[in-house]
Amino acid sequence: MVKVSLDNVKLLVDVDKEPFFKPSSTTVGDILTKDALEFIVLLHRTFNNKRKQLLENRQVVQKKLDSGSYHLDFLPETANIRNDPTWQGPILAPGLINRSTEITGPPLRNMLINALNAPVNTYMTDFEDSASPTWNNMVYGQVNLYDAIRNQIDFDTPRKSYKLNGNVANLPTIIVRPRGWHMVEKHLYVDDEPISASIFDFGLYFYHNAKELIKLGKGPYFYLPKMEHHLEAKLWNDVFCVAQDYIGIPRGTIRATVLIETLPAAFQMEEIIYQLRQHSSGLNCGRWDYIFSTIKRLRNDPNHILPNRNQVTMTSPFMDAYVKRLINTCHRRGVHAMGGMAAQIPIKDDPAANEKAMTKVRNDKIRELTNGHDGSWVAHPALAPICNEVFINMGTPNQIYFIPENVVTAANLLETKIPNGEITTEGIVQNLDIGLQYMEAWLRGSGCVPINNLMEDAATAEVSRCQLYQWVKHGVTLKDTGEKVTPELTEKILKEQVERLSKASPLGDKNKFALAAKYFLPEIRGEKFSEFLTTLLYDEIVSTKATPTDLSKL
């Protein structure tokens, strides 16, 4: 049994005791209380060894894939779970019955208010890919959620007043996405190791808000990212059970939707729902991360080279198969099957281009509705009416009753050949342009970045980096020039893009394009491959102090 104790726990930041968003009096000190820290430290000590073992297991799978002796497939040892038609997910939770339009975004105070005021059903508040994990972003995200749930989030800036449109009980249901199992929070050390970022984000939010959310007629609801194995879902389930027992609420109060955004997880969808069981609220199609994971896990196999990113769509064979299997799986088990992101943002100065972009969104949502999804994501409040218009055609709060008849095989999930797919110089430029712009903003503390009229998050930068690594590694030939993709070519174009973007930057010489390029270069030359850009760059945004805070004074 793990003892509840803050011995050998070091908090390497000052704890703000002054409110930052008046008239609210909430401070960081109200979040980092002694009892809240004891709770997250207990969870970390109980589950961290298992977390690390599961991360090591990912690399075991990668080595087997790289050797060519192993191919991804449905797990024989869990066939009994897949073949048992009797088990189901739980009864749908209050506030999670109709999820036809979900908005997403980081927990910045203004964005939180705008999202809660949007004409949507649910709001995925994101500590993960659309947030740069600076200490202030993470801890003030907790402050902002604490205030929103207590109807005290309104605040003024010199240019604008931000106010909720009513009682939060009647506004969109909040679903929090903590950081993935692979990330750590280096501002808080437990037993000489940084605490799991997943447990930090989940634990603080749950500890302070679970009972308040139940009073609102909702509950502590989560989105779980980046999982690659059903045992990683079991780990979350174990965390949930301990957390609910600790604060004295019934097991099954927590609900979690899992993003199927890694290739290995696509072969274990039923097992993931099964492991969460009473806590499951379905699965979601995380399209860009799924493409990133497909390239990452198959990067050394010349049979799985993807073309220019704009040619990899939701109707590409391997993507279409994954979507159809997800919907069939979820609905057979009685849980939601959520669609993917519409990343478009309004183009205010070009009505024709804006209409074209909105038509693309509408067509994408129609495809999702027709396939059988129960709802979908938008990145901007202006897109919510389009999603609403489409999904109102369900005529019901969801379409879980509709089980599409389709058989998706392991071979279908690995069918990465895209008809008429091409790799061109423009594809290299586009990957470098998007990757550099996103990384530069992330290093400055922004994880939700408008680029070329799309709201981009970390997944799109990951695709950029992986594609370039893969094209260099396999020496592909460019369709437009006949030139071979080499480390020298990608480095040359990288330097050109850095120069162009630096000159155009409104920050002048304070921009971080050179720093972004330093990390990008060995990856796009094919010299190294990091599991995640976010972990690669993380130390650049950590801001710890030498002397730990005295926890007895919290």
Curated annotation (Swiss-Prot):
Broad class of enzyme this protein falls into: transferase
One of the protein's GO biological processes: glyoxylate cycle
InterPro entries hit by this protein: Malate_synth_C_sf (IPR044856), Malate_synth_sf (IPR011076), Malate_synthA (IPR006252), Malate_synthase_CS (IPR019830), Malate_synthase_TIM (IPR001465), MS_C (IPR048355), MS_N (IPR048356), MS_N_TIM-barrel_dom (IPR046363)
Pathway(s) it belongs to: Carbohydrate metabolism; glyoxylate cycle; (S)-malate from isocitrate: step 2/2
Active site: residue positions: R177 (proton acceptor), D457 (proton donor)
SUPFAM superfamilies found in the cross-reference section: Malate synthase G (SSF51645)
Top-level division of the source organism's lineage: Eukaryota
Coiled-coil region(s): none
EC number: 2.3.3.9
Pfam families to which the protein is assigned, alphabetical: MS_C (PF20659), MS_N (PF20656), MS_TIM-barrel (PF01274)
Reactions catalysed: glyoxylate + acetyl-CoA + H2O = (S)-malate + CoA + H(+)
Keyword Metal-binding: no
Any single Gene Ontology cellular-component annotation: peroxisomal matrix
Subcellular location(s) of the protein: Peroxisome matrix
Gene Ontology MF annotations: malate synthase activity
Upregulating conditions: Expression is sensitive to carbon catabolite repression, but nearly insensitive to nitrogen catabolite repression.
PANTHER family: MALATE SYNTHASE, MALATE SYNTHASE 1-RELATED
Subunit composition and interactions: Interacts with PEX9.
Family (UniProt): Belongs to the malate synthase family.
Name assigned to this protein: Malate synthase 1
Organism: Saccharomyces cerevisiae (strain ATCC 204508 / S288c) (Baker's yeast)
